[in-house]
Amino acid sequence: MNSKHLVGGLGMTTTGEQVTVIVYPYRLPKRLKPLTECVLETQKNFSNEAIGTVLLLCIDPKAKFELVCRNDLRVVIVPPNHPLFRETLETMPRLCGFVHLVYAALHDLASGIASSKVFAYAVNQCPNDYREWSKGIGDEADEVLSYIIAELSTDPKFYRQFAVFAD
């Protein structure tokens, strides 16, 4: 995993603090050091003033709400069952396809269809059809999701709403 696989944007807290919001659509790794290094690398694409707090929205159902600090970087891991997860998605600029993908995975997790697995879905604007687009789990899903992000990033509207972080 590297920074080109992360999607997100800049947000503002209710207290006016600028934060970086990143959607992390994979299982959370057991060791968080490589992940925080990747986030730090991602931050550099924003400029130094963005370094501070990162909200990492994680769709891994086993993730716990926690704060991880590395150097000057504070990463807040926000699991899908935490109120901050939904609130943050709702206040971010809409990338309807990607948000649909995240919610599709969350819907299945909540329904027990994939109780311990996170699926990656190809983006499909017909909500009833997304299960047909299931592409597997684990590394295979990571590759599919990377492909989806790459495809979306060619759309000019994508850049106006969200940032795609590339190496």
What function would you assign to each model-found segment?
Residues M1-D167:
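Charge-rich (often acidic), low-complexity intrinsically disordered regions concentrated
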